[in-house]
């Protein structure tokens, strides 16, 4: 199904979702040197630049029936994910927008290939009630993927001004040890674990359990301050692709995807909303992440994103406190 109209500002807006049959992924021995443009619109020769075409030399793709697994696949503005079933809340795998290089749909074989730096994800479209239904599903996925690739990596809110700098340099340093300031009571997240569990189902909290295999909880775009050597170490707000898993919080270069900083969640003490200046619209979505030895200030795209990030961090902190109290 192609999603209906939703709020355009939502990074998690669903572009399309349907059942697809997954083939075991194929690894790439060589990472592409450049991201292919979406101008090929998923055509047969639309593999990302830097890929060899050795995996496209067969007219028909081999499909071992013993490995057929049908998953509920969801394409959002900022990520592609697939789930065991439509009702599952925890994804088997989530690939952020900046990790998806290109796609290819083979109408002859009914196969969708999604290219990432490390592997190719291959899915087969299930047979519809008739050929027309099957072709319509492929067409809808093609339209959704073209829209997905034509947008920037995630649905970011572009912020301008003298305190912002979109240019990245290898010697930029993320600013730490800032004064976090008093927390605001506007969005209080100081719930006990028992209160949280009584309000949410336990399956949701399994997402934050650090004992589980590492998996993505959420991802998006946040601004944080960096010291710019070219500006004599003056601090500027700069945007990063960020990812929160059940074990770590990672900041990646918005332009290159290179990991810039990783924080183990065991080191995080608290996450608080800063005492934001309501008179300045651009300064009312700031929050701070506090660890044992540093503090980092972040700016979200909007108020709801800020609240979501705080709640996600708080949830991870709370479940760790519970496990520690139970000596698990």
Curated annotation (Swiss-Prot):
Residues 215-318 form the PH domain. The gene is OPY1. It comes from Saccharomyces cerevisiae (strain ATCC 204508 / S288c) (Baker's yeast). InterPro entries: Opy1, PH-like_dom_sf, PH_domain. GO terms for molecular function: phosphatidylinositol-3,4-bisphosphate binding; phosphatidylinositol-4,5-bisphosphate binding; phospholipid binding. PROSITE patterns: PH_DOMAIN. Binds phosphatidylinositol 4,5-bisphosphate (PtdIns(4,5)P2/PIP2) at the cell membrane. Negatively regulates the activity of phosphatidylinositol 4-phosphate 5-kinase MSS4. Transmembrane segments: none annotated. Disruption phenotype: Increases cellular level of phosphatidylinositol 4,5-bisphosphate (PtdIns(4,5)P2/PIP2). This is Pleckstrin homology domain protein OPY1. It is a peripheral membrane protein. GO terms for biological process: negative regulation of 1-phosphatidyl-1D-myo-inositol 4,5-bisphosphate biosynthetic process. Interacts with MSS4 (via N-terminus); to negatively regulate MSS4 kinase activity. Keywords: Cell membrane, Cytoplasm, Membrane. Residues 213-328 are annotated as: Required for targeting to the cell membrane. It is found in: Cell membrane; Cytoplasm. Residues 24-41 have a biased composition (Polar residues). The PH domain interacts with membranes containing phosphatidylinositol 4,5-bisphosphate (PtdIns(4,5)P2/PIP2). Present with 1560 molecules/cell in log phase SD medium. Residues 19-52 are annotated as: Disordered. GO terms for cellular component: cytoplasm; mitochondrion; plasma membrane. Pfam families: PH.
């Amino acid at each position: 199904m192609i999603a209906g109209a939703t709020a355009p500002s939502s990074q998690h807006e669903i572009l399309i979702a349907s059942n697809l049959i997954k083939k075991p992924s194929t690894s790439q021995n060589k990472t592409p040197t450049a991201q292919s443009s979406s101008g090929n619109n998923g055509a047969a020769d639309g593999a990302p630049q830097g890929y060899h075409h050795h995996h496209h030399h067969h007219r028909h793709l081999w499909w071992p029936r013993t490995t057929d697994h049908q998953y509920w696949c969801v394409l959002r503005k900022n990520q592609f994910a697939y789930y065991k079933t439509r009702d599952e809340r925890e994804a088997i795998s989530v690939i952020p927008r900046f990790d998806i290089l290109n796609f290819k749909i083979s109408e002859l074989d009914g196969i969708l290939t999604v290219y990432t730096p490390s592997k190719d994800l291959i899915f087969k479209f299930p047979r519809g009630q008739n050929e027309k239904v099957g072709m319509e599903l492929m067409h809808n996925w093609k339209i959704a993927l073209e829209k997905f690739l034509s947008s920037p990596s995630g649905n970011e809110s572009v912020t301008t001004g003298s305190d912002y700098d979109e240019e990245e340099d290898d010697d930029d340093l993320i600013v730490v040890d800032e004064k976090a300031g008093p927390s605001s009571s506007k969005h209080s997240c100081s719930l006990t674990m028992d209160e949280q569990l009584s309000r949410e189902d336990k399956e949701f909290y399994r997402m934050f359990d650090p004992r589980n295999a590492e998996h993505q909880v959420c991802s998006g775009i946040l601004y944080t301050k960096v010291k710019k050597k070219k500006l004599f170490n003056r601090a500027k707000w700069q945007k990063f692709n960020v990812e929160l898993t059940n074990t770590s919080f990672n900041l990646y270069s918005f332009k290159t995807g290179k990991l810039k900083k990783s924080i183990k969640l065991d080191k995080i003490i608290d996450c608080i909303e800063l005492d934001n200046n309501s008179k300045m619209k651009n300064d009312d979505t700031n929050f701070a992440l506090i660890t044992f030895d540093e503090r980092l200030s972040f700016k979200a795209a909007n108020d709801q994103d800020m609240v979501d990030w705080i709640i996600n961090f708080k949830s991870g902190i709370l479940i760790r406190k519970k496990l520690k109290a139970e000596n698990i």
